[in-house]
Swiss-Prot record:
UniProt cross-references to CDD domains, sorted A to Z: bZIP_Zip1
Job description of the protein: Acts as an accessory factor in the activation of sulfur amino acids metabolism genes. Possesses no intrinsic transcription activation abilities. Binds to the MET16 promoter as a complex with MET4 and CBF1. Enhances the DNA-binding activity of CBF1.
Signal peptide: none
GO cellular component, one term: transcription regulator complex
Organism the protein comes from: Saccharomyces cerevisiae (strain ATCC 204508 / S288c) (Baker's yeast)
A Gene Ontology biological process term: regulation of sulfur amino acid metabolic process
Gene it is expressed from: MET28
Name by which UniProt lists this protein: Transcriptional activator of sulfur metabolism MET28
Protein family: Belongs to the bZIP family.
């Protein structure tokens, strides 16, 4: 069964229910149940109701607040014996799926386009961040190599000065030893 046939079947069920004496309150409750269960029929009926009432904001706020839509001031309870009004709604409902599916396709395409653009921006930012990180890594490696060279240079200087100090200490200790020997011999 195609989507359009399913839609026609559901709208016919509502038409039959309204002929059997379903009042506005029951229809309103049924509509609220369809909308709250996120059914396709409920969303289409809501769209149709919003378009036909002209007071979409008030109607949406009533539905969101859980108020009974039948109490909506600008909606009128259909009079008994007026089947023509309900069949007119059914005809409009059958036309609605085509426009809604086109709108849904446009929305999906727009969403897909935005997601593609966002993904592209993300990939560009990721590449840029990787490039920046590689540059930072290269700079840090250069600094590390310079610091290692400096450490090596300082170690060599340290060894040189240690050797100098040892030489000076050795000369001083020999001199001191010779002074002690002379004093001891002179006695």
């Amino acid at each position: 069964m195609s989507a359009k046939q399913g839609w026609e079947k559901k709208s016919t069920n509502i038409d039959i229910a309204s002929r059997k004496g379903m009042n506005v309150n029951n229809l309103s409750e049924h509509l609220q149940n369809l909308i709250s269960s996120d059914s396709e029929l409920g969303s289409r009926l809501l769209s149709l109701l919003l378009v036909s009432s002209g007071n979409a904001e008030e109607l949406i706020s009533m539905i969101n607040n859980g108020q009974d839509v039948s109490q909506f001031k600008k909606l009128r309870e259909p009079r008994k014996g007026k089947v023509a009004a309900t069949t007119a709604v059914v005809v409009k409902e059958e036309e609605a799926p085509v426009s809604t599916s086109n709108e849904l396709d446009k929305i999906k395409q727009e969403r897909r386009r935005k997601n593609t653009e966002a993904s592209q921006r993300f990939r560009i930012r990721k590449k840029q961040k990787n490039f920046e990180n590689m540059n930072k890594l290269q700079n840090l490696n250069t600094q590390i190599n310079k610091l290692r060279d400096r450490i090596e240079q300082l170690n060599k200087e340290n060894e040189f000065w240690k050797a100098k100090l040892n030489d000076i200490n050795e000369i001083k200790s020999l001199k001191l030893l010779n002074d002690i020997k002379r004093r001891n011999m002179g006695r």
